[in-house]
Every structure is written in structure tokens, then in C-alpha cells.
């Protein structure tokens, strides 16, 4: 076999076709964002993988055979093992002024949880210790209680990050995974945080509230969102994310029959390939977030692993608005407004369609006032001012006001979709009267809305794992309609332009999903420097208060030397 190095294109595996560094931002914000975002070299970089590196990667045996596996469906006994119950069995360190980083209490719980799975026989022996980076994984022993103090002495920052990212890879089914639901209990999220005038705050009983929280409510609006989220992901994948012409191998190996490329199997369906599991804050282990869509490569084990030339991570929070759902065959204000929008394809008709319901998805507020907290999308552009405006004397704190100013100059892309082609079974975006496929409108994300806070927390958590990458979050708003009788039971493939052919046959609108009408893609700008430290400090403070409440002052401390992180 030729011993010369095997090379492959160093071009990143994913590129955003239409989200360039300066778009869709406008005004002064465009210049600032453009200056912050690093651009890739126009020349194609070349990387190489030496045979000796391949041998080292395979030295421990067949790497695919040792891929970590954690089940999504759990026995009833396992589902009752919560972080809070595990933490209540811990003990304070000898010197109360020296505390462990809470991440080690979280990982100690996860190790024992996976250990119980070993005892149940639903995962391989040694999985618990292998998850936490043990060089010689050993089987879990019944009755074991892992002390956070011990982990803090043996785990490096790299092994902590690896363990947290491995958990993310095993929980990508999100709400369909019992493991995802169990690990979220006892984690702080954007919804369990309180947001005061100066930023994030914690409820005194935040851990108890999170642990005892009921499951996701089963109402029509949420059902609509869960059903159509994958359609929105496919639309984003088709309209914004393009695979590079030369695919990037996750690992190049020689299994004995010649060199070959090995790719992450989960990436075979692009929309689902970008789905994320539960990400825990690598800084503290207190905060958790689950992203709807993250444009990032994964290694052969399914773990997030940005390509070496990828400097920007784009992620999307998807919201499907059920309140616009209508039957196109019935005469109604929404159906009429939609017919006019599809006929004329103007910004005026777009505004009329959005206002065809009682509470439009875009709220107008005067530039001298502040928006409410009801709608996730807002505008203060005079062309969007309705005939009747209720004047209010709303107030908001500095935290929200600063973020309103930061997002004020941002604009949204709006995509309008043609009626499905029943013969070719495709759906394509329609051109607006301007000739554009994506109409830029002066609509931005509302910092007072829970969706904005959710994205802010997601960005904070993600930044802890990839601190050297520029983050670009977007809020995606999907609006769809009921199917006509002739459309029922059909799966439609998405084209990225009217005259184009399907770019990827896996980017589809499934038969159970609504027919897409509109897609808003809105950039979200957060004050990274002002937020990250606040969230981290508040998280540590909240955890320490919870620990103090649990640990009685007379409880016997561990006899070992205290460890601080």
C-alpha cells in the first residue's frame, strides 16, 4: 500500500450560503458584527492524516465497536434516581470556605446513574467509568456512592468536557428520551431562572422546582410544534446550510482492505443530523440547555466536534406558531389574507396576513416606549405601525433595555413558499415582488420574551464548550397551514429555489406535517461580555445556597483534605 500521506479538503463541511458575516444585520450593527466574525481564507486549506495517526486511533481495537451507548427508554426504578436525591447523600468539605465546583457533583451523580444501568443490564459493564474517562474501565459495584471530591482529583478539564459532550450525544431525542428528561431534573434552565432588572436570578428553591417539574404539557400548540419542528429544520438545512462539495471524513482508517472514509452515520439525514441533546454547563454543571439545531460536525461517536477550519457555530431555536394554522379550503380572514399574500407577494400583504388574527406574531411598539413580553418578534418601524395602537407606560430594567438597543438594527429574513407541486411532489420558496427569495424586514427578537432568554442561556452553555468559536444564534418562526385533501398523505421534497431541483432528498415535509407558508429567520444578539459572568456567578451562588440548606452545620465532614476548583 502507498505510504504517502492521504489528504482531504480542509474546507469546512458546512457553509451558510446566505448568512454572510454582514447579513442579515443592518446599520451600525452590521459593521460591528462583520468586524467580530472571523472569515475563512478563500484558498482551500489542506490537512493530512498520517498512517501512524490512524494506527494510534485504532490501537485499542475497533473504534466503532466501542461507541458509547446509553438507552433512551429506562426502567421505572432508574427514572426515580434524581440528582437532588443523590446530592442529599453528599457531605460538606472540612473547610466550608473551600468548595468544589458543582460540575463534579453532577458528574458523580451521572456516574452512579449509569452504574445503576449497568446493574440493570441495559448498558455494558464499565460504561460508567468509561464515560468519565477511566483508562481501565471497571464494572460498577452495587452500593457504590461516587464522591465529587474524588472526581475533582482525577478528572481534567478535558475529561469533564468530554463527559458532558458524550451525554449530549446520547440525548439527541430530547423529549422522546427518558434519559434526557431525567438528566434535566435538577438542572437550571432559562424557564427556571428569574430575570430581574439587572439580569438572571435564581429562585431560592430552584433545584427542587426543577426536580419536581411536571413533564412537557400535551396541548395542541405544543403538539403542533413537536410535529413540525423537523420540517423547520429541513427548511433551514435546504435554504441556509450547504454541504461543501468535498465531504470531510470524520476519520480515515485502513481496516485491512484499503483506505476508506468513515462518516458519522447520524449525519445521513441533514435536518436530524443538526439536532442536539442536553448540553450541561461545563463551567458549573448547574445550567442545562437543549438546542433545536446546531450546525456543527460530529466525530464517529456522534460527539460534537467542529471541523478544524470552522470558526463560527450557527444555531437555531425553532418556534412553530399554531395560532396561524388554518384550512385553505374554508373562507376565513386568515385564508383570504394568505391568498392575497401568495398572489401579490409584497411586504404590505405580509403585514396584512400577520394581522389577520387577533394577536399578531409581530408586535409594534413606539420607539419612545418599550415592547411587551407577549410576542417573540417585535418592530418599531413606522411602516409596521397598525391603525390602532394602545399607548402604554411600560417599563423594563436595564438588562432588557440594553438588549433591545443591541437588537434594534437587526432585520429578519422572511421566506414565502409556493403551493406544493403535486406532480413533482416538491415545495419551493416563492420570489417576492422585489425578485428576492428572502425578504428583509425590520423585525427583531424581543429581549423581554422567554424565547430570547432561552437563546441567551443556550449561547452561554455552548460558549463554555467552544470558547474559541464565534456563536451566531437565530430565532426561527415557522408558520404553516392545514393540508388540502389532494395533499394528504404526501411527503414533499424541499427545493432551495423555484427553478432548482431538490438539493437533498432527505430535506422533506413529512406527510404528518403542515404545509409551510412562511419562515422567519431572525438573528439574536446577546451581550456576551455582560451576561456570561453574571450567569456563572449566579449559578455558583444558587448552588452553594442549596448545598448550605441541605448540609446541616453539624453534619460530619469528609476526613480527606478539602479540594477547591
UniProtKB/Swiss-Prot annotation:
Pfam family, one: Viral_alk_exo
Alphabetical list of InterPro entries matching this protein: Herpes_alk_exo (IPR001616), PDDEXK-like_dom_sf (IPR011604), Restrct_endonuc-II-like (IPR011335), Viral_alk_exo (IPR034720)
Localization per record: Host nucleus; Host cytoplasm
Entry EC number(s): 3.1.-.-
Identification of the protein by name: Alkaline nuclease
One CC-aspect GO term: host cell nucleus
Lineage per the UniProt record: Viruses, Duplodnaviria, Heunggongvirae, Peploviricota, Herviviricetes
EC class of the enzyme, as a word: hydrolase
Site (Required for function): 229, 292, 317, 319
Function noted in UniProt: Plays a role in processing non linear or branched viral DNA intermediates in order to promote the production of mature packaged unit-length linear progeny viral DNA molecules. Exhibits endonuclease and exonuclease activities and accepts both double-stranded and single-stranded DNA as substrate. Exonuclease digestion of DNA is in the 5'-> 3' direction and the products are 5'-monophosphate nucleosides. Additionally, forms a recombinase with the major DNA-binding protein, which displays strand exchange activity.
